[in-house]
């Protein structure tokens, strides 16, 4: 295939195609060959075979079937069991008793000739495979589940969906309770981190789904839709009970998602909270700019009322100028600036002030508030983000069957910043995208829009954001007929009561340069997503709570699922197809009815059951290693003291540097003798790290151990370590652990690993850290009974 990715160097013209994408091509090559030879060839097949298509391949008379790509994915060799199960189920379904009779019955052939029946099956399958959505690019969610999180030596397990969610939503836990049918518990889990479950259950951009581990198996979980199901099932739940009033007051400027989020967490902890909103309603851009076919008024009102019922006061129609801002600072202990980005960007081209040119915020607000905006039958939407998609789909519903709506974008669809889901909905509804079109001028006649001139573009070199920059094609100017132009190229924050320099915030706490004044959401980020705004509100609230000497625990819940590591691994070796996004038929999308319907109970539970609970056990690197070089071992969770020896006039005093906390019993190491450093574990590890490099690396022989600058070797009751070429040793004897380094020997307690005594050798250092000794003690104790200890 043509090298169009960033994996191989640019000078490489071609790249290797394998797996799923290759399957329809290869099965058609097999069909062509068998047609030429009347089905008499013996064909060995290896091209995207998996547990689901194996029965069809066997029915085509093709064998042996060899597998590579599928077994290099999470689940690894454990996936093979499902191959046999699916094949056995297919044979039983045909009531066949061997492969030959299966081929005959699958073909529904009365000829009783296996060779002829197999060829018939192959022709049919080859014809159907290219149109099977399982082999289309759109069926894959995202490119990788890797995140920016570092990979530590110990305690690396964290579900990538949680780490990707700006609100830190404990997704695996509410999946677990949903699958069990305990919707009350699922709701409680959601509300620990997310005060807007109804809103985010409908319109969250759900980046968590792009990092769902299931994406490497079949399809990501419908996380957002399950949240929506749980929110709806708990619509009448009584409010949480806040802590008693703590005497602290907080003023929040803006009743959008960020302000509402902060108010929720603060109210729970007993703060007196008042929100000051410029509009006559709460919700900010959520209530004013998202079309009702995506977000219902009921969902918004439900979340807002829940927060108000905690004692939060919302004052509407409030103009905040410098004087009022100073009053808020004086009358409250803390102020949170949480305004949205409510100014639409302009293109700066001729004709932009003509009648018929509308910005997307005004247009979407007019429609949402039922002000019935007047637009022409031909509408051009300029932009490629989610707001542009919303504006285009809304305009389509207004112009009717006789109108035409087109999106004008200066790059290609592949570079659009809009969510893939939103782009797909746009295309499904029949809206055309004019790619590589840069607006130059809005044609005006009689003061009104009469069309638009666009420069045709082509993609050039990549810019800092990774997208290829559009460059003009000389002389290629085209006319785009339209009577209405809706600009959707971005939004600005309009903030006149505080200076830009004062708005600079601490990236951790959210505090501005003004003491006890915080800012977050669009006010700091610029126009961004709802869930990021919610996350900012949560973060600021927690920091205000901490400043006030309080504490609110919103961390993930620890749930005992009654499964051991082996059972988690078995679950993670099975592919389970998910349900498709439950959208209503395109023919029914003429009005503003909700496009994505609610999941029913059976759908929600079935989908939630697909969760792999990778916040409990991950072991992806273990399963994807074809050489079995990544190895699972177990430690004793607990708090361990990292100690150091301080030389005081020739005598050593033991002090504690810090505490090393291990919370996870399942850990991973790498066996260097087995590892060829192929990097497959790096590809699928949800962190930014390389398991074969970052995990403790053990060697099985003294020879291989001594060849490495950084390594471990366990043999009997001795563990050796090499760090940058220097060798250390830990030995178990006399009911203790003895640590040996050149200048320092020490005796460690066998259970707590605390230093009992030190024995300096030679020149006494001023200080000596026993951090490596502690790590070696943990590793030795955990591995002394391992199979590779000899």
Stretches with model-predicted labels:
Residues 137-139, 146-152, 221-223, 227-245, ...:
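Flanking helices and flexible, charged tails adjoining ferredoxin-like Fe-S electron-transfer domains
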Residues 14, 78, 82, 92-244, ...:
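Ferredoxin-type iron-sulfur electron-transfer modules and their immediate structural context
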Residues 252-274, 315-326, 343-345, 361-420, ...:
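Rossmann-like dinucleotide/flavin-binding elements
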Residues 169-179, 187, 216, 220-224, ...:
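Beta1-alpha1 glycine-rich phosphate/pyrophosphate-binding loop at the start
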Residues 41-54, 318-319:
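Glycine-rich beta-to-alpha transition loops that act as phosphate-gripper elements at the mouths
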Residues 318-335, 445-477:
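Conserved beta-strand-loop-beta-strand element in the redox core of flavoprotein oxidoreductases
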Residues 56-83:
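Glycine-rich phosphate-binding active-site loops on the catalytic face of alpha/beta enzymes
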Residues 1-39, 74-85, 92:
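Glycine/Thr-rich beta-alpha phosphate-binding loop at enzyme active sites
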């Amino acid at each position: 295939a043509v090298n169009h990715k960033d994996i191989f160097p640019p000078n490489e013209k071609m790249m290797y195609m394998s797996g799923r994408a290759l399957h329809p091509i290869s099965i058609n090559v097999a069909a062509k060959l068998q047609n030429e030879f009347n089905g008499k060839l013996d064909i060995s097949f290896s091209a995207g075979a998996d547990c689901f298509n194996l029965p069809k391949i066997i029915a085509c008379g093709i064998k042996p079937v060899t597998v590579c790509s599928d077994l290099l994915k999470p689940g690894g060799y454990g996936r093979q069991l499902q191959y046999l199960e699916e094949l056995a189920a297919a044979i039983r379904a045909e009531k066949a008793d061997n492969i030959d009779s299966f081929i005959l019955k699958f073909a529904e052939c009365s000829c009783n000739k296996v060779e002829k029946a197999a060829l018939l099956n192959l022709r049919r399958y080859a014809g159907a495979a290219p149109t099977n959505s399982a082999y289309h690019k759109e069926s894959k969610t995202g490119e990788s589940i890797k995140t920016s999180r570092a990979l530590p030596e110990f305690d690396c397990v964290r579900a990538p969906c949680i780490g990707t969610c700006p609100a830190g939503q404990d997704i695996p836990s509410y999946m677990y309770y949903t699958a069990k049918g305990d919707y009350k518990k699922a709701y409680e889990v959601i509300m620990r981190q997310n005060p807007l479950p109804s809103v985010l259950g409908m319109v969250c951009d759900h980046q968590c789904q792009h990092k769902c581990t299931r994406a490497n198996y079949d399809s990501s979980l419908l996380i957002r839709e399950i949240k929506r199901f749980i929110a709806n099932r708990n619509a009448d739940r009584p409010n949480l009970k806040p802590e008693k009033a703590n005497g602290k007051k907080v003023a929040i400027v803006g009743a959008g998602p960020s302000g509402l989020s902060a108010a929720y967490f603060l109210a729970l902890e007993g703060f007196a909270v008042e929100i000051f909103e410029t509009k006559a309603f709460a919700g900010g851009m959520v209530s004013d700019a998202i079309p009702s076919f995506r977000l219902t008024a009921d969902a918004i009102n439900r979340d807002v009322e829940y927060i108000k019922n905690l004692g939060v006061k919302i004052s509407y129609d409030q103009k905040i100028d410098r004087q009022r801002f100073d009053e808020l600072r004086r009358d409250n202990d803390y102020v949170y600036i949480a305004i949205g980005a409510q100014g639409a960007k302009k293109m700066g081209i001729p004709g932009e002030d003509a009648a018929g040119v509308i910005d997307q915020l005004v247009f979407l607000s007019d429609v949402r508030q039922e002000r019935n905006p007047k637009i022409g039958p031909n509408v051009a939407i300029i932009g490629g983000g989610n707001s542009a998609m919303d504006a285009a789909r809304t305009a389509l519903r207004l112009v009717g069957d006789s109108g035409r709506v087109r999106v004008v974008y200066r790059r290609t669809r592949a570079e659009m910043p809009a969510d893939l889901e939103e782009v797909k909905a746009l295309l499904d509804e029949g809206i055309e995208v004019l790619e590589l079109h840069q607006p130059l001028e809005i044609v005006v006649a009689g003061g009104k829009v009469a069309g638009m001139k666009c420069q045709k573009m082509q993609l050039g070199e990549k810019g800092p954001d990774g997208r290829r920059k559009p460059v003009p094609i000389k002389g290629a100017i085209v006319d785009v007929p339209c009577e209405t132009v809706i600009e959707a190229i971005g939004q600005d924050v309009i903030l006149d009561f505080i200076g830009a320099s004062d708005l600079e915030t601490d990236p951790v706490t959210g505090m501005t340069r003004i003491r006890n004044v915080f800012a977050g959401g669009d006010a700091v980020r610029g126009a961004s997503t709802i869930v990021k705004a919610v996350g900012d509100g949560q973060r600021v609230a927690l920091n205000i709570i901490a400043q006030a000497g309080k504490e609110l625990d919103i961390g993930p819940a620890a749930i005992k699922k009654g499964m051991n590591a082996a059972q988690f691994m078995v679950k993670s070796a099975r592919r389970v197809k998910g349900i498709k996004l439950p959208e209503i038929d395109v023919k029914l999308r003429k009005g503003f009815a909700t496009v994505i319907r609610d999941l029913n109970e059976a759908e929600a539970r079935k989908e939630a059951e697909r969760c792999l609970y990778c916040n409990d056990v991950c072991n992806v690197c273990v399963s994807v290693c074809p050489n079995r070089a990544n190895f699972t071992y177990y430690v004793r969770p607990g708090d361990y003291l990292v100690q150091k020896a301080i030389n005081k006039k020739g005598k050593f005093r033991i002090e504690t540097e810090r505490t090393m906390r291990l919370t996870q019993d399942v850990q991973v190491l790498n066996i260097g003798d087995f590892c060829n450093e192929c990097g497959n574990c790096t590809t699928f590890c949800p962190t930014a790290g390389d398991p074969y490099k970052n995990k403790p690396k053990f060697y099985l022989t003294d020879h291989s151990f001594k060849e490495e600058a950084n390594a471990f070797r366990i043999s009997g009751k001795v563990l050796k370590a090499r760090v940058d070429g220097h060798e250390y040793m830990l030995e178990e004897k006399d009911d203790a652990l003895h640590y040996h380094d050149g200048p320092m020997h020490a005796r460690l307690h066998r259970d707590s690993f605390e230093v009992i005594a030190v024995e300096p050798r030679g020149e006494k250092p001023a200080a000596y850290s026993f951090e490596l000794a502690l790590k070696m003690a943990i590793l030795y104790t955990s591995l002394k009974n391992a199979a590779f200890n000899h």
